[in-house]
Amino acid sequence: MSQPLFTATVSAVGGREGKVISSDRVLELDVAMPGTPRAKKLEKATNPEQLFAAGYAACFDSALQLVARTERVKVETEVTANVSLLKDEADQGYKLGVTLQVKGEGVSASELEALVKKAHGVCPYSKATSGNIDVTLEVAE
């Protein structure tokens, strides 16, 4: 394994109906499944899919900007990650599905699509999910 540039550390207590806390305490969030009594009772609660979506969107947008800089292309981008909890018919368990919606200003749709494909090849989240999670890339017109 390569030498880490940095390591993020977060602990969970109570699973999907508990809390997550980062070692530096920047994150200290209640976790609840949407629609559960706990979720209805809490004013603000997140869930693992929402946290994954936040990380993937930020990471992919950074990868997209890296690719654009490398290609000397100036583009303003916005990435929205939709992460769904799905029933896994293979084992009757659960799995994740991801749709990344990318908007860009300053380039044509075909140029943006090419940048998105390249970003998907270098994004650490995309690398981690490759072959494990179905990821759909959508480029907004």
Swiss-Prot record:
InterPro entries named in the record: KH_dom-like_a/b (IPR015946), OHR (IPR019953), OsmC/Ohr_fam (IPR003718), OsmC/Ohrsf (IPR036102)
GO biological process annotation, one example: response to oxidative stress
Protein family (similarity comment): Belongs to the OsmC/Ohr family.
Name of the protein this chain belongs to: Organic hydroperoxide resistance protein OhrA
Protein induction: Strongly and specifically induced by organic peroxides. Repressed by OhrR.
Organism: Bacillus subtilis (strain 168)
PANTHER family listed in its UniProt record: ORGANIC HYDROPEROXIDE RESISTANCE PROTEIN-LIKE
SUPFAM superfamilies: OsmC-like
Protein task: Involved in organic hydroperoxide resistance.
A Pfam family: OsmC
